[in-house]
């Protein structure tokens, strides 16, 4: 387990960009189609360091915490979904300035036996250990920075995804992540077009000054013209505006899930058509075989639990930061990924 007392080495990075969240749900829906056909994973969770004196790791993926025993649930398959903003160059002192950032991060955990889904959202300003590189691609080692920058130190493709996957896995106490999917924001309008619009209720007043249509409590339909404002905009002059936006994105995800399932039930070819349309905006190491067959199962279950990494937003020396509550996160990991045993 990571050391909760580790110093936060805040690297000053000019990294204020807009968050992309709307792309994520389509990734989730697409890959629900894949999950049931993935063989039972044999990966073992790595041993964890002590989070406190009453927690320790024993053999065979079994740990003890507060006098109770927990074993990792081998029925789980975990996938990382990233929303990438690459329209603006990522301003880092080292690394690839044009790689973009993973400004929306979600982990989907699928129990292949119970057919249940849990989605964990990770604030883009989460401070955690990431690997950094110089302009020549040489590793500079690990340092604490915004988790969104892990992707930026790669190539904007496979390497970036692997770096982000490693950072997320480490944040979640080395939980195994079997696959990833990253979507660029330029595919955002395709999502609205594919389902013919997304009706939802505006959850807060964060957009009212930008567009009077988005008053708190208003019922609106997101389309190709207004979807970007709803899922991307935030006032960068306001502290913790990324957290406010993340809450708005969750509303979008739930609404899009409903629309996608209805569209699929009317037209089973919807998923495969959308997958093809998104190819030029997507990087993934996951296959697309038998998507439609699995969608039939996923449409009856949906996402059972939706969680956010526990922590607190603070103002850093240069930019907003999200500091994880290590003890609460550890307990959440036990709840989601482990089963209590004798």
Where are these regions (language model features)?
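Non-catalytic, solvent-exposed segments at the cell envelope interface
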Residues: 2-3, 12-16, 22, 30-342
């Amino acid at each position: 387990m990571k050391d909760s007392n580790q110093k936060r080495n805040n690297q000053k990075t000019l990294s204020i960009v807009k968050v992309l969240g709307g792309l994520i749900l389509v990734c989730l829906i697409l890959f629900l189609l894949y999950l049931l056909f993935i063989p039972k994973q044999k990966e073992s969770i790595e041993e964890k360091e002590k989070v406190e004196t009453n927690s320790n790791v024993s053999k065979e993926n079994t740990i003890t915490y507060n006098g109770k025993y927990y074993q990792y649930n081998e029925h789980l398959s975990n996938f990382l979904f990233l929303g990438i903003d690459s329209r603006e160059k990522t301003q880092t002192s080292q690394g690839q300035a044009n790689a973009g950032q993973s400004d929306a991060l979600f982990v989907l955990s699928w129990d292949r036996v119970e057919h249940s889904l849990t989605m964990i959202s990770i604030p883009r300003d989460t401070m955690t250990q990431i690997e950094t590189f110089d302009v020549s691609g040489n590793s500079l080692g690990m340092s604490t920075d915004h988790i969104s920058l892990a992707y930026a130190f790669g190539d904007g493709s496979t390497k970036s995804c692997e770096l982000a996957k490693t950072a997320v896995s480490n944040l979640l106490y080395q939980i195994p992540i079997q696959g990833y999917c990253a979507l660029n924001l330029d595919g955002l309008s395709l999502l609205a077009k594919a389902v013919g619009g997304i009706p939802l209720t505006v959850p807060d007043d964060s957009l009212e000054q930008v567009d009077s249509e988005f008053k708190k409590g208003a019922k609106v339909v997101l389309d190709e013209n207004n979807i970007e404002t709803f899922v991307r905009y935030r006032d960068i002059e306001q502290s913790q505006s990324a957290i406010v936006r993340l809450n708005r994105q969750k509303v979008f995800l739930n609404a899009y899930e409903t629309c996608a399932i209805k569209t699929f039930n009317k037209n089973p070819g919807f998923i495969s058509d959308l997958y093809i349309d998104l190819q030029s905006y997507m990087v993934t190491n996951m296959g697309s075989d038998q998507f439609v067959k699995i969608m039939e199962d996923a449409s009856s279950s949906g996402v059972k639990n939706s969680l956010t990494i526990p922590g607190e937003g603070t103002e850093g020396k240069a930019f907003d930061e999200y500091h994880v509550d290590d003890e609460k996160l550890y307990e959440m990991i036990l709840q989601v990924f482990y089963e209590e045993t004798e």
